[in-house]
Amino acid sequence: MSDSAPEIETPVEEAPKAASPAKSPAKSPGRAKKAKKDGSDKPKKPKAIPTHPPVSEMVVNALKTLNEKGGSSVIAIKKFLVATYKVEIEKLLPFIKKFLKGAVLKGEVLQVKGTGASGSFKMPPPAKKVDRPESAPKKKATKTKTRVERKEKKVVAKKPKPAVEKKAAKPAAKKAAAKPAAKKAAAKPAAKKPAAKASPKKAAAKPKAKPTPKKSTPAKPKAAARKPAKKSK
């Protein structure tokens, strides 16, 4: 009897799990839209450079060139622009009407007939030229005149100060009047001086009377002679 060898269980190796794919970060909807737009955007066409001048300049040129006495209608202006500038007139028509309305209000264009953007239009007559250099010196002259008048007014306003001088002049006049009085007073003593001169004449006359005392001296002996007569009694 043969013994059977014990079976050895070999561990079964598990197959390695397949690596899970890395999760890609979720794209935001905004970025996704931008990416789509970037991919779908086509190169922009450059803006067409206008081959004609501004509407205002074209309309003014049309009115000056046509120069109709009764004014030019919008239809005539359109024809002129098409013939001269070769423009798509239907696209420019709203701008033409807008310019005409504004120019009429500002006085840049005269509306002969109609109202608004309908009717006929023409350019206003040229304004008369005024010689500005001639008018400018006149203004300067007026300014100088006003300055001179102001200075004269200031001088007139300052004239009340001499009134004080007049008041001071009055005492001077009184002094002048007092001086003649003093002269008169001085003249009076001058009149007295002749009297003083006359007094020496009187004094000179007095010595003539001096011989009289000499006559009186001889009379004294007569009295002395009389005294002895009394003793005889």
Swiss-Prot record:
Biased composition (Low complexity): 17-29
GO cellular component, one term: nucleosome
Keyword Cell membrane (UniProt): no
Subcellular localization: Nucleus; Chromosome
GO biological process: nucleosome assembly
Domain spans labelled H15: 51-125
The entry's keywords: Chromosome, DNA-binding, Nucleus
Region Disordered: start-end pairs: 1-55, 115-233
Superkingdom classification of source: Eukaryota
Pfam families membership: Linker_histone
SMART domains: H15
Basic and acidic residues bias (residue ranges): 128-137, 146-155
Bias kind Basic residues: ranges: 172-213, 223-233
SUPFAM superfamilies from the UniProt entry: Winged helix' DNA-binding domain (SSF46785)
One example GO MF annotation: DNA binding
Entry's family note: Belongs to the histone H1/H5 family.
UniProt function note: Histones H1 are necessary for the condensation of nucleosome chains into higher-order structures.
Protein name in the entry: Histone H1-I
